[in-house]
């Protein structure tokens, strides 16, 4: 019986490792409930997400909310306005790369402003250690913020991936952050659909990014 129990435990550990390696997830700044060493413990009532790399939805269905998890960490990483974050990813299957967006919110995900966009080339050929530099805007106000990563893959099922990290920004006291709202595509029926684009000659939906709505985030001075 002890032998069977040991085998079962080993199998569960192996399955968890394989699950984390499937697809791609944000690992730095630590995505909410990421199992990586060094990431904070989940807040009370939440648990480590061993399926952190899984998509949150497809063009036909919504599996999880934007960010994947909505309860923020109690411990946050601190970055300065104007600082460049070398974002990192747990890479399993990069699906030929695709489109990525990074955005900030100061109201826990109600309003987002995009701070970087990569068309087609994001995660193309990505392997362990893959990193993308993302700069916090120099005029970003101080305060608690949510840092979001979105990815629409080039090859495979029409999916949307999203992870969020909880950060503290040290910038000016109050102010505005202007930009565009993120494109939320391949996320349930009725959402914009970006088809597969494994070849450079195939339509990739980039025209949808040009239609993103302008948005202004206002943070009150303290």
Give a label for each model feature.
Residues 135-139:
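Proline-anchored loop/turn motifs at beta-strand termini and strand-loop-strand connectors
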Residues 149-151:
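Conserved structural position at the C-terminal beta-strand
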Residues 2-10, 14-100, 108-114, 118-132, ...:
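Peripheral, solvent-exposed domain-edge segments
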Residues 140-146:
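Short glycine/proline/serine/threonine-rich loop/turn segments at secondary-structure transition edges
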